[in-house]
Amino acid sequence: MTGKTAPAAAKKAPAAKKAPAPASKKAPEPAPKEKPAPTPKEGHAPTPKEEHAPPPKEEHAPPPKEEHAPAPAAETPPAPEHPPDAEQPAAPAAEHAPTPTHEAAPAHEEGPPPAAPAEAPAPEPEPEKPKEEPPSVPLSLAVEEVTENSVTLTWKAPEHTGKSSLDGYVVEICKDGSTDWTAVNKEPFLSTRYKIHDLASGEKVHVRVKAISASGTSDPATLEQPVLIREITDLPRIRLPRQLRQVYVRHVGEAVNLLIPFQGKPQPQVTWTKDNQPLDTSRVNIRNTDKDTIFFIRTAQRSDSGKYQLSVRINGAEDKAILDIRVIERPGPPQNLKLVDVWGFNVALEWSPPADNGNSEIKGYTVQKSDKKSGKWFTVLERCTRTSCTISDLIIGNTYSFRVFSENACGMSETAAVAAGVAHIKKTVYQPQKIPERDMMEPPKFTQPLTDRATTRGYSTHLFCSVRGFPQPKIIWMKNKMEIREDPKYIAMIEQGVCSLEIRKPSPFDAGVYTCKAVNPLGEASVDCKLDVKMPK
């Protein structure tokens, strides 16, 4: 600190020089006394300074104006050349305030006090950061292979690694009967497979694995059973038959006899559980050999349904299989069967699914009817997948009852739901609605009149008009007010109310006024036209 404050003292020295001349002149006298002061300053600076402060105070008491010099003087003590100048201004300050004489020492030591405030913020404790959670336990620790002097382990990464990434794993072993765990690997590794070497043949060891990260170490994943160090020539493997890879269904009362082969050398240990619980030996019989296991239930009950787990283990090596066995029976009858509506020769029915489905999905419903006269039941619908239906083609005048069976994979329900009411199909006489007769009588009326025509001699021509009326009117053709009777030169026709007159090879004599007259009992009507026959050029 002495080296750092020296420049500051040098810079502030001029401020001290600006003080009155007598102060600067008398400075050399205490200088020899102050030269040894820097050495004690490093250890116990305050004591020597307080001892030398009073003599200069008495000498320079008259000039009180130098009270403003203490600040620069405080910064100058580290410099050995100018300490006298700094101490002289500090003396008057001490004279005017004898009580703060102890404060004078800090004034001389304003160089060291800055160290004290600098130390004050340092001790303030920073708020502790919340500790990060360590990784979770590694998953699915298992033995992959065992030889005469080694064990190969496999596992899966933990579900949670925390905010820090995973640094690796540590594998530890402990001899059976001991509690001392020893790390096998010196440094963490990231692989989820590890082979432990140099193990004694015939020895049993416990194995566990820990996950490590910057936030801490996880709880260990430990094998349930110790591993016997001996060579496994053939790893355990279950050869599950194809029909057992899906739900195995049996009916209530039937026997369940399953043979499941497996392999493994030396002979593996076989374990059966049901829904992760030990088997009920009063219901299930198990017989094991070195190559297969037999699962036998003499009389199956619905309570025997569930998921059975087969485990084949050699030391830590293990293979598992799950058998899903379902024992079913006939379902119960449908519920709440009722007649919803009866109209014409139709009936609408509704019901609810059975309370007991027999441990199997309901495939459909069978609906039957019975007429009051015969009393026999006849099936009208099979495998109806809905809980409602409409029955048609019932005989008018009969009274019908209805019942419904439910059906699953085991068969139809033993009993049926019978509708409380009956449906009576009433006789109804159909009377067509009478249509009022319409008066179609109408006098003749031409809807299309004749038009004047011009033709050339020797070229046949036609005259057309249309008429309506009821009864159908009689048509009379006339030429120049004279009725045309049966003349081969003229051909008259009427079809769908269209009247036509053909004049064959007309001559100038055939020119004139032609009239079409329609007559019926209600009246008559007529139209005229003019025909002009020209001579060819």
From Swiss-Prot:
GO cellular component, as recorded: A band; M band; myosin filament
Family the UniProt entry places it in: Belongs to the immunoglobulin superfamily. MyBP family.
Pro residues bias spans: 112-124
Keyword Metal-binding part of the UniProt annotation: no
Tissue/organ expression: Skeletal muscle. Seems to be also expressed in the slow tonic ald muscle. Not detected in gizzard or heart.
Region (Disordered): 1-138
Gene3D superfamilies, A to Z: Immunoglobulins
Biased composition regions of type Low complexity, renumbered to the chain: 1-25, 87-104
Function: Binds to myosin; probably involved in interaction with thick myofilaments in the A-band.
Organism: Gallus gallus
Lineage, top ranks: Eukaryota, Metazoa, Chordata, Craniata, Vertebrata
UniProt cross-references to InterPro entries, sorted A to Z: FN3_dom (IPR003961), FN3_sf (IPR036116), Ig-like_dom (IPR007110), Ig-like_dom_sf (IPR036179), Ig-like_fold (IPR013783), Ig_I-set (IPR013098), Ig_sub (IPR003599), Ig_sub2 (IPR003598)
Name this protein carries in UniProt: Myosin-binding protein H
GO annotation terms (biological process): cell adhesion; sarcomere organization
